[in-house]
Amino acid sequence: MVKRVQLVLTKDVSKLGRSGDLVDVAPGYARNYLIPQSLATHATPGILKQVERRREQERQRQLELRQQALEQKESLEKVGSLKIAKQVGENEAIFGTVTSQDVADAIQAATSQEVDRRGITIPDIGKLGTYKAEIKLFSDVTAQIDIEVVAS
């Protein structure tokens, strides 16, 4: 029978777990590596209560963020179409391309809402016309918005 020690991780440890996880490890691993490196502490009843309280707070925070994302999605989809003006060459081909930063700036101007440009997915836009952009607001909340590229 192998003895195991219960620890609560204080930092992320590769191949073991994330900060706040309750893990069972060999006593030598705990005594010689995890505890001296301040990567974990012994799982006492008080620490387990703290961990549970932190998890509940994180759960509540995630629910609030998701609710805010849903509200932001509704307001973004009410906007309809965003107009982005670009210089045009022959055959309605635009100079450069429309970037996610351009879309984020257009959203900021139209709705005064900050949107992270890294969450915006747009197709390759090289000509004038109407395109669909997908904006990821939360892990499972995505808004669709029309982008109209017009000549400046």
Swiss-Prot record:
Keyword Iron-sulfur carried by entry: no
Gene Ontology CC, one term: ribosome
Classification via Pfam families: Ribosomal_L9_C (PF03948), Ribosomal_L9_N (PF01281)
GO terms, biological process: translation
Transmembrane portions of the chain: none
Any GO molecular function: structural constituent of ribosome
Keyword rRNA processing applies: no
Cross-referenced InterPro entries: Ribosomal_bL9, Ribosomal_bL9/RNase_H1_N, Ribosomal_bL9_bac/chp, Ribosomal_bL9_C, Ribosomal_bL9_C_sf, Ribosomal_bL9_N, Ribosomal_bL9_N_sf
This protein's UniProt keywords: Ribonucleoprotein, Ribosomal protein, RNA-binding, rRNA-binding
Record family assignment: Belongs to the bacterial ribosomal protein bL9 family.
PANTHER family registered for this protein in UniProt: 50S RIBOSOMAL PROTEIN L9
Family annotation (HAMAP family): Ribosomal_bL9
Protein function: Binds to the 23S rRNA.
The protein, known as: Large ribosomal subunit protein bL9
